Amino acid sequence: MINKRFIIFIFILFISYIISFINFISNLNKDNITHVQSKTIVVITGSVGRLTAAENLINLNSEARLLISGVAKGVKFSEIIKSKSIDPKKVDLGYNAKSTFGNAIETKVWVSNNNIKDFILITDDWHMKRALLLFKNSMPNINIYPYELKSNSKSLREHLLFEEHLKYLIAHLQVIYIWFTN
């Protein structure tokens, strides 16, 4: 026979998850494109729209610098950046990250090596909450300005939200790891 306390615990856990999920999705439909001017841009690889947004921002600021984090091994600048007006010397390709946690660590090293105080972070709306959690905890003294791109596909978006919410919960454990290692 199942213990009554265990059933109550499972019920509380389920309700907590539902509340957490509602909180997670509550900010997704807001316009969260930053209007801050920063000379530094970080884009996490993923959708093509992320790179297009990064190209547009770097073209608006002749002094801007760009890190593309999470680039697959062997991929060259010319395969990623389609705009001929972008100076390759202003773009760094990060080949070490394999996850959002890895993107945060890769960016932390790049920020430290380049004495950067702030940057615009570009990723999709469904990914931003987790990315900001990891990036801000990896670099607490750096100002990070989110530049969220709206997801286009509704069915893909609905599927991703549940998966992304679970990853967001797991990211909290990664934050604990960051705290212990800093």
Where are these regions (language model features)?
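Short, Lys/Arg-enriched, disordered terminal segments
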Residues: M1-I10, N32, N115, Y177-N182
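A structural signal for short, hydrophobic/glycine-enriched beta-strand patches
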Residues: F24-F162
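Hydrophobic membrane-insertion alpha-helices, especially the h-region
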Residues: R5-N23
